[in-house]
């Protein structure tokens, strides 16, 4: 009964700290100030209902064309010939373009950011593997929810997951601000109560990408001596740190125990908000602000888009590691009030989650799970049970792939 009460509390705890989210409030406040300098907060808000990524949607979008494009909406079903032809032209024009920020910036400029976000989701799920995994994720979420409702806690964990150690890589200032969710406390506690082997990697909370990647590499080497099956889970800033550790610092032979890497809202190719922080003359202003808030400025240059894209281009992840990116893909009506300024600033660059461009979260060769309806901070009351669903799904996927190789 004690286990049941504790687990119930963990699953149902309101996600005000954004369970999977990973950025300290002080840093966010600074980046919000940057965004507000030039952000235009005004854009259309057209009510719409429909479905995205197997999920019911009720929100607002920024253009009639986006409303027409949303699957399951009345506008989508009854769209005019002109709208259908225009959408078909865009799909044909961009259908063979890479899923990168350049493509989605062009789509946004020609249509609207919400249209581009819907196109991003559709393109991701047009991949057979992504479509299959997304469907599996939806089913697993419903299975876990049903078992929780019935209080069958032990059954929420798939047997395949129990054979893995789960190594969580925390986000920015996870020690100074435990309310941010950057330390995965809710997920770790719930999973531990359900009998899973979990560990938090102790990284430098405001260290550089390179410094923390070295720490992660050392931890993986050490844990690999005792565990042959490890799933690594990172969030936000820890995403590029993990990629660097697994894809450059460690030799492929040193990563054989790492079976999967789950990147949650990963700043894989940085954030344009960091670009503004490190650019003169703003850089000296923010050095003073950061010093006052006791935040290390030195970690930010590594989060710029130029540094991050160059770094990622030099990384080669071992093929045996299953990479899964869990991407929040909000429409404009899904953005929380305290995120709207950053989102609005980034809109001119294309679909974004309020901290980074959606395309910049993608890891080459990775499997994508879309979470529509939420911004970068995943303020979803069900985020903790969804974390179980993602972990279960990844373990099952690993088992299926292993069986096919035999």
Predicted features and spans:
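N-terminal secretory signal peptides that target proteins for export/translocation
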Residues: 1-20
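Bacterial N-terminal signal peptides
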Residues: 28-38
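Flexible, membrane-associating and regulatory peripheral segments of lipid-active enzymes
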Residues: 40-179
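C-terminal catalytic-base region of ester-bond hydrolases, centering on the histidine
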Residues: 46-84, 318-406
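Active-site catalytic motif of lipid deacylating hydrolases and related acyltransferases
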Residues: 157-230
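Solvent-exposed loop/turn segments at secondary-structure junctions
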Residues: 172-175, 205-207, 236-240, 266-270, ...
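Short aromatic-enriched loop/helix-cap "lid" or pocket-rim segments at secondary-structure transitions
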Residues: 180, 271-277, 334-339
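Serine-dependent carboxylesterase/thioesterase catalytic core
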Residues: 214-312
